[in-house]
Amino acid sequence: MTVNALRKNPGEGLLTLSGVTDWNEGAHSTGLFRNFVIAADETEDVGGTNRGPNPPELVLAALGACITVGIAYSAAEDGVELRSIELDVEGDIDLKGFFKRDLNADVRPGFQAIRVTVWVDADAPPGKVAEIVRRGGEERSPVTDMLVNPVPVTVRLEQKVPAKR
């Protein structure tokens, strides 16, 4: 999908992305999104088997990847040649939020803060690079937008009928 194609047919920009996540055991699950398998698990100190990043780490990875794409596309739009982009993405989370029922804690289960540090080696003055990073990381990143602005999430139960024996 190109910008010109979206100018001609704006409705074609509306997408529904989807995948399937299956529980394996304990805290280990596997997601299938397009043709990509993504494992998730918890660390051993919180009852997992450490067979993949935990879900909050996957959110940080998605944020870092999304900002990287936004920076690369923004630089290309401006004719700026990039030599490298590197991001450090970190988030503060209080596990009492996840275990709040057991601990009677009044703490959110999600991140309290997320910080992204970006290093860019580019053929452009520092002010131009800063503008590209701002545009790529704040203006056009869908993941940044989802984390900054509330998005309705609906969890619906579909009861499986046990197989006949």
Task: Write out the residue ranges for each language-model feature.
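Extended beta-strand/beta-hairpin segments
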Residues: 1-61, 73-165
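Alpha-helical metal-binding/catalytic segments enriched in His/Glu/Asp
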Residues: 63-67
